[in-house]
Amino acid sequence: PYVFLHVTSAKSSLPVESRTAANNEALKRLFDAGAYSQTLNSALYLYQLTYEGHRQTAIVGDISIEAFEDGRVIPHERTREFRANDLANHLENIGIHSSPVALAYDGDEAVNALIQEAMQTEPILDFCREDNLEQTIWRVPDQIADKLLILFQNKATFIVDGHHRMNASHTVWDRSGRTERFSKILGALFSACLLYTSDA
């Protein structure tokens, strides 16, 4: 019962209202069980994936929906309206993002140096799956995070995965009257020169 997939499961055999209720109940169950610790202050995180000798590290944090609207976040795929609407309704009802949009940015030595500096701290999570995919997470120290935010302020990024989620988030932001609550989406930013994707 303590698996986040229950929060995002479509359960297409159920009516929409029942699906939403089941998703909300699954989320409440996770919170009640203490599955997540509360982060009181805003923070950036590093998420590193290591598999078969390849290592890539993402900067994880909130991305402004305005950056998508003004062209700093650049899509390269068309989206299907019904899929984006389905995700928008889910986000509106659940109120949280289920997974980050993956973004790529042009290689940057200054960014890489700050990432390496942040990785000198103790990771908050470090584990390996049965398929040998190793995952490590660090909280970025505030002084390093401030420098990263400045470097990314006007940097263009490209959507690698998550076009429908980005579209859905923009829709919900509009529906809400562009309120602060829905003005951001969770993003994972990878250096394009180190990015590895697999169709498997």
Task: Give the ranges of each region predicted by the language model.
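Short, structured patches in soluble enzyme cores that scaffold and shape functional sites
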Residues: S64, Y105-G107, D161, H170, ...
